[in-house]
C-alpha cells in the first residue's frame, strides 16, 4: 500500500547475517513483504550465498593471528577490525551487484555499523540509516591493557566516520544513544531510540496463569538459560552456583545452547537442549515450561533474549551492565546482579524460586513492558516513517 505518500521509497536493508541479526532480518522480511507505509524494501544478508572468492576473503580477514586466551592482551592482530571490515566488504559487493543489475535505492539501512565499513562513499550519495546496539565501548570496557585498547582504534575511528556520514542513527537503547554522543561529541547526526521488535509467542496469553497454577500444585520451578556463547553469557557462573547451592534439590534448569558442553559433566538437575531454532515449536515449548529466565551475562550490549523472556511472561535475572537494566527493571520485571558475582546470583535465584507470587507479578509486568516497548507493528510504522524522512518524503 502506498497511500498518501506518492511513489514509494526504495530502501535496501543490509544485514550482517550473524546470530540475533537474522531475527531482525526475519522481522523485515515479514513486515515489509509488500510495499507498506510508503516504503518498498529489498534486503540482503551479507553472509548468504558467498562466492568462492568471498569465502577466501573471509578466511584471510577473520583468521586469528594472536592468541585469545584467558590472560594477557587480546586483539593485537586487529582481529576485530579485520572481521568488521570483512562484513563491510561483503556488503559492498552485494550493493555493487544490485546496482549493476540496474537497481537504484533512495535509502540504505545498515544493520549494524560494520556492514557500512566499505561504503562511506556510497553513504555520501545515498541517504543512509545506521542501526546500532553499541559503539566500540562494549569491547573497550573489557580491555586488559593500554595496548589492547589502542588495537581497537581503527574500529573506533571507522565507526565515527560512519556515524557522521549517516543521515540517521537508530539505536536499540538509551545507553547506546548516549554512547554515540559521549564517544563522538562532534557527531551531529540525529539519533533515535527504537528497541528491537519482539513478537509475543503465539497463544501465550495464559502462560503466566498456567505457571502459577503449576506452582500451586507443587510443581518444581524450572529455570531457563538461552545463550550461544556459553562462557560470555555467564553460563559457567550459573553452573557453579547451581552446583554449590544444590539447587537441583528444589528446582530444575534447562540450558538452550549450541556451545560444545559435555552433557556428561553437567550437575544434577540440568538438561541440555541443542539444535533448537528460534521461534519454532520446540523453542516456544521451553519458554512455556519455564518459570524463571536466567542469563548472568558478563558481556552484553543489549540482550534481545531478555526481551523474549518478557514477551513470554517470565521474570528475568540479568546483570547490571550497559543496556540490560533498560529491559530487566530491577525489582519490577526481574532481578539484576553484578556480572560474575555468584553470591548475588544465588540469592536472586532463591528469591524467585521461593515465591510463585513474585514470579507471577514480575512476569506480568515484564510482558506488559514488552508489549508497550517492542511492538513489531509500531516498530514497522516508526521505521517506515524514519525511512521516508531520510528520503525527504
Regions found by a protein language model. Give the residues of each.
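Membrane-proximal helix-turn-helix segments that form the acceptor-binding/catalytic region
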Residues: 149-169
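Carbohydrate-associated surface elements
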Residues: 175, 197
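Aromatic "clamp/platform" in nucleotide-sugar-dependent glycosyltransferases that forms part
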Residues: 298
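Short hydrophobic beta-strand element within catalytic cores of glycosyltransferases
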Residues: 315-318, 328
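Conserved acidic donor-binding segment of nucleotide-sugar-dependent glycosyltransferases
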Residues: 330-331, 335-342, 351-357
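A short, well-ordered alpha-helix in the C-terminal region of glycosyltransferases
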Residues: 351, 358-373, 379-382
Amino acid at each position: 500500500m502506498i497511500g498518501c505518500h506518492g511513489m514509494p521509497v526504495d530502501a535496501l536493508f543490509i544485514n550482517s547475517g550473524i546470530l540475533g541479526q537474522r531475527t531482525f532480518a526475519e522481522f523485515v522480511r515479514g513486515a515489509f513483504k509488500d510495499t507498506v507505509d510508503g516504503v518498498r524494501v529489498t534486503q540482503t544478508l551479507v553472509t548468504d550465498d558467498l562466492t568462492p572468492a568471498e569465502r577466501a576473503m573471509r578466511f584471510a580477514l577473520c583468521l586469528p593471528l594472536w592468541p585469545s586466551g584467558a590472560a594477557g592482551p587480546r586483539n593485537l592482530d586487529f582481529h576485530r577490525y579485520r572481521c568488521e571490515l570483512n562484513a563491510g566488504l561483503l556488503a559492498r559487493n552485494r550493493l555493487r551487484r544490485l546496482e549493476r543489475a540496474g537497481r537504484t535505492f533512495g535509502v540504505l539501512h545498515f544493520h549494524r555499523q560494520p556492514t557500512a565499513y566499505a561504503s562511506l562513499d556510497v553513504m555520501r550519495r545515498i541517504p543512509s540509516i545506521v542501526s546500532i546496539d553499541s559503539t566500540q565501548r562494549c569491547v573497550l570496557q573489557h580491555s586488559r591493557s593500554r595496548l589492547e585498547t589502542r588495537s581497537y582504534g581503527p574500529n573506533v575511528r571507522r565507526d565515527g566516520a560512519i556515524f557522521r556520514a549517516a543521515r540517521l542513527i537508530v539505536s536499540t537503547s538509551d545507553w547506546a544513544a548516549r554512547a554515540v554522543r559521549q564517544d563522538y561529541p562532534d557527531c551531529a547526526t540525529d539519533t533515535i531510540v527504537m528497541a528491537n521488535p519482539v513478537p509475543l509467542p503465539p497463544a501465550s496469553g495464559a502462560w503466566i496463569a498456567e505457571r502459577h497454577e503449576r506452582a500451586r500444585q507443587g510443581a518444581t520451578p524450572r529455570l531457563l538459560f538461552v545463550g550461544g556463547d556459553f562462557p560470555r553469557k555467564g553460563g559457567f557462573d550459573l553452573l557453579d552456583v547451581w552446583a554449590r547451592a544444590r539447587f537441583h534439590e528444589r528446582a530444575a534448569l534447562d540450558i538452550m545452547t549450541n556451545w560444545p558442553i559435555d552433557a556428561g559433566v553437567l550437575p544434577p538437575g540440568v538438561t541440555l537442549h541443542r539444535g533448537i531454532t528460534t521461534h519454532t515449536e520446540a523453542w516456544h515449548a521451553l519458554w512455556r515450561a519455564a518459570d524463571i529466565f536466567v542469563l548472568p551475562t558478563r558481556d552484553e550490549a543489549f540482550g534481545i533474549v531478555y526481551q523474549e523472556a518478557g514477551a513470554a511472561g517470565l521474570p528475568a535475572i540479568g546483570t547490571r551492565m550497559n543496556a540490560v537494566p533498560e529491559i530487566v527493571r530491577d525489582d519490577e520485571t526481574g532481578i539484576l546482579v553484578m556480572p560474575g558475582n555468584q553470591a548475588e546470583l544465588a540469592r536472586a535465584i532463591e528469591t524467585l524460586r521461593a515465591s510463585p507470587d513474585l514470579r507471577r507479578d514480575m512476569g506480568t509486568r515484564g510482558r506488559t513492558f514488552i508489549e508497550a516497548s517492542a511492538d513489531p507493528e509500531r516498530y514497522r510504522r516508526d521505521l517506515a516513517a524514519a525511512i521516508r524522512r531520510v528520503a525527504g518524503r
